[in-house]
Amino acid sequence: MKKKSCTKRIIAIATAIIITIASIFVYINIKPVSVDYGMSELYTQQDMDSAIELIKESINSRKGCKLYSLSYAGDNLSSKELDYCNSLERSEELFTECIVFDSCFRSPIFGGGGWNANSLYYWNWYLARTDDGPWQLVSWGYA
C-alpha cells in the first residue's frame, strides 16, 4: 500500500514540475517586446516604429531567437554614426539620416548556427535612410 502512495506522490510532483516549466516557457515566448523610445528631437515615434519593424523582422528570421527589448540609443549617437552608415554602403546616394537601437534577445534554446545555447545577446542595430525614405538595416551586432 505504501509503495502505491509513494508512486502517486512521485507522479504528482513530476507533473507539477512539468506544468511549471511549460508555463514559464509559454510566458517567456508570449511576453511582448519592451520598447524604449527615449527622447528624440530628430525622430517621431512613427519613424522609430518603421525602423523597429525591420529589426523585428531580422530577429524573427533567426530561427529560435526571441527579442526582449529595444531602446533608442539617442539623438547624439544616431547623428554621430551617419558617417559610419555611409561607409558601409556602396550606394551612389549618401544616407542623410541614421538611427541606432540597442537590443536584448535570447538565442535558440539549443544553440547551433554560431549561437551559444539559450544565451542573452546585447546587440546594436544601425539603420539609415535618405531624405525621409524607407529605413535600411545597414549593420547589427556587438557595439
Question: What residue ranges belong to the model's regions?
Answer:
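Short beta-strand edge/turn micro-motifs at domain boundaries
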Residues: L120-A143
